[in-house]
């Protein structure tokens, strides 16, 4: 990914995202369950945050730690308002986006968004999201490269999804049920309710849990953290487990209504619960952190089955087994997303070899497999071979996938067109990785035949930019491609202003088109979106210096006018980011 290079330049986040996700899951559930379940990392983070929280509340900690935290409030009576919650979420996400385990895979993210957006629309239509909450919160899902089965909600409407969760779900409805559940934790404001329903010590625990990850990134003093871990455990909320279970049941109920209103199968939630319950009984090696933060009970499973059975036309009776439901129409697309997640969640060589080995199956071996399983296995093997740079085996699996499309036209005609497009994008990726740019263009061209089509497909947009930036095409052919990519990317980021990958691609395209001022501005926006505000300001100041030199030496009026407009934008953005950074510093000083 292009943003990986940006992260490498300004350094990764100073905490481990996988540990955060495994330890945090949903912050509300940890509030209820207390601290003993946390990882060593999160214990350290919570301890440091507790020091600051106790200082703010007037308590005397065992060790004074010099840490700066965003101001949450001095007393438990302070309202944990929408602005505060969003601000905390934004600050956490600025760190998460810089972590190596944060993954922006365009195909997988587009698939998750294709489930998320109908859920969000249904929640709005049902009145689960008030106008103020809708406007204030981010409503943004993101992906985490981790094999464990997990999803979690953060303050401000951010939802994390582990690739391991996508990899183990059999249908889009199962995955949608988890997204709907996590969305409901946000819409019902469970984090804020946990704080509001507690005493002052509960606020300390809340501050520790929500802000601990930020404290850990700002403090290197583990001695201070260890000195107060016992105290922080004692200060944690007691007797809240029943309340947490009420929250889980509420999220189940609201989430079920939202997902069915969005058009997903009523059996999806029950199917997911049954799958998690069965898997956890046979595997208790820590691969299912979702169950630690969202404890499944017989009651919750029974309620999910009862809700599914009560939906008119669901065909669910007392003998219903959720896994026996017919596959939804978009099963091909889900199978491709599942296969991609399985490969990308663990890119170590041994893991890739296991998925690559699927290409050894003969036609007789797969004769009884359903189409979606055959296609998923072929694409998993092709992607694994591509990452291993073993092109002959990649071609073998790609040919099998293409043959499945060719000989099953009716199935693909009925499926979402994104399934066939996903295979083409994988093919283009494989060709590009081996330096065959001309072949990559040939494969992708049907899907980028118009600017409008490119603008509606982020994966095609970014792949087109990668092709334009690669070597291997004559300049006469590549210049129009670069120009089209610049126009399409500029249109995209004007709407999706925090798309770091798109901004990074745009910066490189402008550089290739000999537009250094625009390239600097785009690079600055990419850094800003990743949470590197200092790097963003550095790029913007470099743009200001370049604009002054250009204005002094320019002889072409049109070029000068264009540079003046871009320079004005750079000046404005620099003022905005400086003001945001100043406000954040002021909050840290108030809490320090």
Give the residues covered by each predicted segment:
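Short alpha-helical catalytic segment bearing the HExxH-like zincin motif
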Residues: 160, 174-182
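Extracytoplasmic and endomembrane cell-envelope/extracellular-matrix remodeling and assembly machinery
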Residues: 74-75, 102, 110, 128, ...
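Hydrophobic or amphipathic, alpha-helical segments that drive membrane association/targeting
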Residues: 28, 33-45, 49-152, 279-281, ...
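Catalytic Zn2+-binding segment of zinc metalloproteases
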Residues: 173, 183-199
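Active-site scaffold of zinc-dependent metalloenzymes
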Residues: 146-172, 189
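N-terminal secretory signal peptides that target proteins for export/translocation
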Residues: 1-42
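Membrane-active amphipathic alpha-helices enriched in small hydrophobic residues
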Residues: 203-218, 227-235
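Acidic/histidine metal-binding catalytic segments
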Residues: 108, 195-207, 224-227, 263-273
């Amino acid at each position: 990914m292009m943003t990986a290079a940006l992260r490498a330049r300004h350094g990764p986040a100073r905490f481990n995202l996988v540990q955060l996700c495994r330890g945090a899951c949903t912050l509300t559930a940890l509030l209820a369950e207390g601290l003993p379940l946390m990882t060593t990392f999160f214990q350290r983070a919570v301890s440091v945050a507790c020091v600051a929280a106790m200082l703010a509340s007037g308590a005397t900690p065992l060790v004074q730690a010099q840490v700066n935290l965003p101001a949450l409030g001095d007393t438990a009576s302070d309202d944990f308002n929408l602005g505060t919650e969003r601000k905390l979420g934004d600050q956490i996400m600025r760190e998460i986006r810089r972590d190596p385990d944060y993954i922006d895979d365009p195909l997988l993210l587009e698939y998750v968004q294709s489930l998320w957006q109908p859920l969000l629309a249904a929640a709005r239509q049902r009145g689960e999201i008030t106008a103020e909450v809708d406007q204030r919160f981010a409503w943004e899902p993101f992906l985490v490269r981790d094999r464990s089965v997990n999803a979690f909600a953060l303050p401000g409407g951010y939802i994390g999804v582990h690739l391991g969760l996508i990899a183990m779900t059999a249908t889009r409805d199962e995955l949608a049920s988890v997204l709907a559940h996590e969305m409901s934790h946000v819409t019902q404001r469970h984090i804020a309710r946990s704080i509001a329903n507690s005493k002052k010590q509960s606020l300390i625990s809340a501050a520790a849990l929500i802000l601990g990850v930020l404290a850990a990134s700002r403090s290197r003093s583990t001695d201070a953290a260890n000195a107060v871990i016992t105290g922080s455990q004692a200060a944690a909320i007691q007797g809240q487990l029943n309340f947490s279970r009420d929250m889980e049941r509420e999220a189940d109920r609201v989430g079920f209504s939202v997902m069915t209103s969005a058009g997903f199968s009523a059996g999806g939630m029950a199917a997911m619960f049954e799958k998690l319950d069965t898997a956890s009984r046979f595997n208790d090696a820590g691969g299912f952190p979702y169950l630690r933060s969202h404890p499944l009970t017989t009651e919750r499973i029974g309620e999910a089955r009862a809700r599914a059975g009560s939906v008119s036309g669901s065909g669910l009776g007392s003998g219903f087994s959720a896994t026996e439901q017919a596959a939804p129409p978009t099963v091909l697309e889900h199978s491709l997303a599942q296969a991609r997640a399985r490969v990308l969640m663990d890119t170590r060589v041994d893991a890739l070899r296991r998925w690559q080995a699927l290409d050894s199956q003969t036609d007789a071996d797969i004769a009884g497999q359903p189409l979606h399983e055959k296609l998923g296995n072929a694409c998993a093997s092709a992607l694994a071979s591509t990452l291993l740079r073993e092109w002959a085996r990649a071609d073998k699996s790609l040919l099998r996938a293409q043959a499945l499309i060719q000989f099953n036209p009716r199935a693909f005609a009925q499926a979402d067109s994104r399934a066939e497009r996903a295979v083409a994008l994988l093919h283009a990726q494989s060709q590009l990785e081996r330096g065959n740019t001309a072949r990559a263009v040939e494969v992708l061209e049907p899907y980028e035949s118009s600017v409008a089509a490119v603008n509606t497909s982020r994966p095609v947009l970014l792949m087109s930019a990668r092709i334009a930036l690669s070597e291997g095409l004559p300049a006469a052919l590549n210049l129009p491609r670069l120009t089209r990519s610049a126009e399409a990317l500029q249109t995209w980021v004007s709407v999706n202003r925090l798309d770091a990958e798109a901004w990074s691609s745009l910066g490189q395209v402008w550089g290739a088109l000999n537009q250094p001022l625009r390239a600097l501005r785009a690079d600055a926006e990419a850094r800003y979106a990743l949470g590197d505000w200092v790097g963003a300001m550095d790029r913007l100041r470099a743009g200001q210096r370049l604009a002054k030199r250009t204005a002094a030496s320019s002889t072409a009026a049109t070029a000068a006018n264009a540079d003046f407009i871009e320079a004005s934008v750079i000046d404005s953005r620099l003022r905005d980011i400086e003001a945001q950074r100043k406000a954040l510093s002021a909050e840290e000083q108030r809490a320090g």
